[in-house]
Amino acid sequence: MKHTLTKTLLMLLASLLLFCCIGCSGGHSYESDAAYSHLFTETDDDAAKALKNVIIAQLDAYNQGDAEGYYALFNMEREDLNFNVAQFTSMRQNANLSCTPESIDTAFINEDNAQALITMTCRAEDKATGEVLYYYRTTTTYTMVRDGKWKVTLQTPGAEEDLMYTLTATETTTE
């Protein structure tokens, strides 16, 4: 009986430890994902990789239409969160939205603070007509704090490079 109890306690402890390790790792790792592996470099330490995974997960939520998942990274009051989620959901009813990261550079990162520059292309297409509503490239700066989880406290958009002309030129040459 004593041996069985000890064995059960050891199994429970091992399961709890495994759960904590998986739960604390921050979830899915995009480092080996073909769509995102180019965002990681050989010089990235574990902290940079973890931060990049958080940002990619947020953009992935945006692309999947998961408003709650996308806005979960932003440090905002509940009423602001509810407003933004409603706006996002409304936009997604009429348009396909996507933001594709081209690069993520960690400007600095320490135990509780980080700043990352995300260069990405963003695009919206009307669901009914397929018309491209916008298509641009920008570099956005995330200033982040960690209080258990990483949160964006300030999002500073950079200048937008309009890419609509590339669509027009491409469509003109293919028709």
Segment roles from a protein language model:
Residues 111-175:
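Exposed beta-sheet edge and beta->alpha loop/turn motif
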Residues 17, 27-42, 164-175:
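Intrinsically disordered, low-complexity repeat and linker tracts
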Residues 19-23:
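C-terminal motif of bacterial Sec signal peptides marking the signal peptidase cleavage site
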Residues 65-67, 158-159:
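K/E-rich alpha-helical interaction surfaces of small helical-bundle regulatory domains
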Residues 58, 84-88, 92, 155-160:
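Polar/charged side chains located within well-ordered beta-strands of beta-rich proteins
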Residues 24-64, 72-73:
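Short, low-complexity N-terminal intrinsically disordered segments enriched in polar/charged residues
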Residues 53, 67-117, 124:
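Short solvent-exposed beta->alpha transition segments
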Residues 1-12:
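Bacterial N-terminal signal peptides that target proteins for export
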